[in-house]
Amino acid sequence: DPVEGSTLASTAMIQHEIDVPLHVLARKIGAEKAARAWRRSARAVEDLRLRVERLGINCAMTAKQALYLAGNEYGSRALQTEAQTRHEAGIAADYLNAAALQDRFGLSRTGAIVSDFSASANPAQMTAGLLRAAMARGAELVSPVEVTDVEERGETVILATSEGRLLTAGHVVFCTGYEFLKVMESPVHRIISTWALASRPDMARPGWLDGFLVWEASDPYLYFRTASGGRTVSYTHLTLPTKRI
């Protein structure tokens, strides 16, 4: 159903930084394609923020910086390489060594990257606002509908529902969050656990945290940010790789 499920569980950390570091992605698909993907991601965050502002959606949308901490997946040397690769691609990123990180943020890691182009929002309010705007422009919202199977036939996508109906479309976009359809499961990875947590209101926290999204180069990993009412919202996720790509 709209504005339920994984929407309500979302931490709404809207990051331009995609899961694969730029210097790693460049080795996989080439420097030019990788840089383009990262630049488009940064532009997408800014476009979303401006769209929410233009539509007048009240969802606590706020521009944020991101603090990416060294971890067990990528250490200080990898983060130095990553920051340099981003600079070369025209994406601003500042590398902090352990001493600078401790001095500025009071955190003990071997290194970190500070970057712009991220944001946070209330996910339920933002989703509801965007859906209302879409419907005002002629989109149709149908709920509840359970899609049980998907099949591609030429230029057409066919969806089967639990009621026995078949829906056809030229394109289908799945925005299911953590709820995977069986036909979308991948041999590349398997989710072991994922948790979203929120603290009590007015939790004691450093002042700088209100302006940052914090995440780490680890597996399992932890992300966290502040939310309205003085809460701290966090997200932890563990995947089990089954096949390297």
What is each stretch, according to the model?
Residues A31, N58-Y68, A100-G129:
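Helix-loop-beta segment of a Rossmann-like dinucleotide-binding subdomain
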Residues T236-T242:
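Conserved small/polar residues in nucleotide/adenosyl-binding loops
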Residues I14-A98:
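Dinucleotide-binding Rossmann-like beta1-alpha1 core, especially the glycine-rich loop
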Residues Y74-R77, R104-T110, E151-V157:
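A short, glycine/Asx- and small/polar-enriched loop/turn
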Residues G230-Y235:
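Short FAD-binding loop at a beta-strand-to-alpha-helix junction that anchors the flavin cofactor
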Residues D149-A227:
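Flavin-dependent oxidoreductases
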Residues D1-A9:
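Glycine-rich FAD pyrophosphate-binding loop
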Residues I113-T156:
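Helical element adjacent to the flavin cofactor pocket in flavoenzyme catalytic cores
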